[in-house]
Swiss-Prot record:
It comes from Mycobacterium tuberculosis (strain ATCC 25618 / H37Rv). This is Ferredoxin FdxE. The gene is fdxE. The keyword Protease does not apply. Pfam families: Fer4_15. The keyword Iron applies. Its cofactor is [3Fe-4S] cluster. Binds 1 [3Fe-4S] cluster per subunit.
Length: 67
């Protein structure tokens, strides 16, 4: 599973950051600075929770067939 950010949709609610600041870093304005990456197995549920928390749907999960 990969997670990525659509920066044009992020307006700085920081709801993802509230789920887990280490998984969802933000800048000084509250906007996500998440870099696209493969999600570690131990982070899958928190990543799903952070993506679901975004009211602007700026975070995108790309599920692998095996997930």
């Amino acid at each position: 599973m990969k997670v990525r950010l659509d920066p044009s949709r992020c307006v700085g609610h920081a709801q993802c950051y509230a789920v887990d600041p280490d998984l969802f870093p933000i800048d000084d304005s509250g906007n996500s600075i998440l870099a696209e990456h493969e999600v570690r197995p131990e982070d899958m549920q928190l990543t799903r929770d952070g993506v679901a928390a975004c009211p602007e749907m700026a975070l995108i999960l790309e599920e692998d067939d095996a997930d």
